[in-house]
Amino acid sequence: MAREFSLEKTRNIGIMAHVDAGKTTTTERILYYTGKIHKIGETHEGASQMDWMEQEQERGITITSAATTAQWNNHRVNIIDTPGHVDFTIEVQRSLRVLDGAVTVLDSQSGVEPQTETVWRQATEYGVPRIVFANKMDKIGADFLYSVSTLHERLQANAHPIQLPIGSEDEFRGIIDLIKMKAEIYTNDLGTDILEEDIPAEYLEQAEEYREKLVEAVAETDEELMMKYLEGEEITNDELKAAIRKATINVEFFPVLCGSAFKNKGVQLMLDAVIDYLPSPLDIPAIKGVNPDTDAEEERHASDEEPFAALAFKIMTDPFVGRLTFFRVYSGVLNSGSYVLNTSKGKRERIGRILQMHANSRQEIETVYAGDIAAAVGLKDTTTGDSLTDEKAKIILESIHVPEPVIQLMVEPKSKADQDKMGIALSKLAEEDPTFRVETNVETGETVISGMGELHLDVLVDRMRREFKVEANVGAPQVSYRETFRASTQARGFFKRQSGGKGQFGDVWIEFTPNEEGKGFEFENAIVGGVVPREFIPAVEKGLVESMANGVLAGYPIVDVKAKLYDGSYHDVDSSETAFKVAASLALKEAAKSAQPTILEPMMLVTITAPEDNLGDVMGHVTARRGRVDGMEARGNTQIVRAYVPLAEMFGYATVLRSATQGRGTFMMVFDHYEDVPKSVQDEIIKKNGGNA
């Protein structure tokens, strides 16, 4: 079957925003106007097409990034709707990794909000070009130019309007196109009847001012255009559009549009902008990877002629077809029924069926091409971030960074029947979500689940009940602490056992030094002259890794430490891998005496929004919770406080804030970094855990 849409006519986009900015409604309207659905589903009625999980429809928020494909102006647009809630950050990260462009949706009353900053930062890390859609122009307090100013102030983004609204709140009735210098007036409720006319006289001066600002800003990114502009020559609409496209794709410029998805205004123009300004797979740099056989860096271009290479970015369990693996094809062609190599795991996988997804309905297709996003049935060993490639042209693509979980809960099944089902349910949920971890406490036999926040674990426990019919008791949330060393030290680990039969002998000298935050554990072999034989070196590293899983102070994992094995000795007969593993763990215990071990706790970036009258209360809350204020901002009669607060102090804060502000205060928090706990708190944690120190 030949390719339906050329690569030039393909767009892979994500829709990203702060929770409640109207992102899912915007996606719904896109599906409506592109002919994918015939009736519009409203999020607040729990009928949205993209939010297809029961919990999503009940809570009115998007949890998983549903993928769908639509058509507009003879182009194929693959859309991923991502969650705006911080607990589901991995969903945003994995979609950004496989997208070519994104639409950032703002609530035009609030402008840039905390989660907008988080997803914007992530999109910048991945180099994703963006256009901005200032939504909810019909809402009381909507202010388009204020929203644009927040893009400059909070994100330092080179963002400029390519449209202006005609009216706002109840009076919002159309849009001025600053490129064509025409007005688009909406004459019916469904937004399908649009009149193009001259700009109303009362808006003309403002339109000319912003057109001038737009031309100047775009000219700064394009030398040729700059010369024309400075010489006072006429810049044609086509030249302006081409320059905006180029600057947007280079992530140097962000076009800002406006509208109201709920009132069906501005969505078609936003779709036009997706086609006009966001990149096709051909416009983005070739994907880089490593050949697992040669360790050489290789790249794959967006071409059907190159060998097949794809990245699995999401696993989902579908009630009808079972395990679905969502993947983005970077190069080559894949047919259903064929075999691929999972180079990340070194496993051969058979592609049973290939499905094109539309939220939770599906259409079976025979072939996928470079630039496509699809789902496959039949992959057994593939997980998020794995590379799938042609067996004869291996490449491992850069994987997806998975943040460490910061909160944990104990779960126990209510009955023996639930016990067996719970194991299956938890492993399936962990397959789908890499930030969700399941561990069994060896000493107590308890099952501990960890995740990115209370809502995250709440939703997963809820899914366990609904989808897998498992009833479970859930404990109170606990913080995932870590341990580290703050001083450098050298330590010997000596293990010798002679008691009849074969003896054991292992002897190592290891230098431990603190590592940079977030770097994890790094091992260096500095043995010279074979004082520790090469075959035992991996055993030393393994012994350290295993011992570090259970820290020296309170049993929390040790992180961010470098270990350099520099000396030791061995016995011709009695030395073994086991002996060197034990010796390494003894060296770690010895080092702990002088390496200033300390406990680390997760620090959250908390953004509290409260009425001005309650500012004193909020500042008191932060101080009482061992927090430190990072910044404040007044917005009308509301104050926004940003602070770093330990996660351990934030449990139950929603209730405290609600009662202090009569229900008018809200807060959001996102994990930021780990920090040393104060000595008094450390002593408490050690005591509570029957400390190892």
From Swiss-Prot:
Keywords: Cytoplasm, Elongation factor, GTP-binding, Nucleotide-binding, Protein biosynthesis. The keyword Iron does not apply. Residues 8-282 form the tr-type G domain. It holds the Pfam family GTP_EFTU. It is found in: Cytoplasm. GTP binds at residues 17-24, 81-85, 135-138. GO terms for cellular component: cytoplasm. GO terms for molecular function: GTP binding; GTPase activity; translation elongation factor activity. GO terms for biological process: ribosome disassembly. Catalyzes the GTP-dependent ribosomal translocation step during translation elongation. During this step, the ribosome changes from the pre-translocational (PRE) to the post-translocational (POST) state as the newly formed A-site-bound peptidyl-tRNA and P-site-bound deacylated tRNA move to the P and E sites, respectively. Catalyzes the coordinated movement of the two tRNA molecules, the mRNA and conformational changes in the ribosome. Belongs to the TRAFAC class translation factor GTPase superfamily. Classic translation factor GTPase family. EF-G/EF-2 subfamily. This is Elongation factor G.
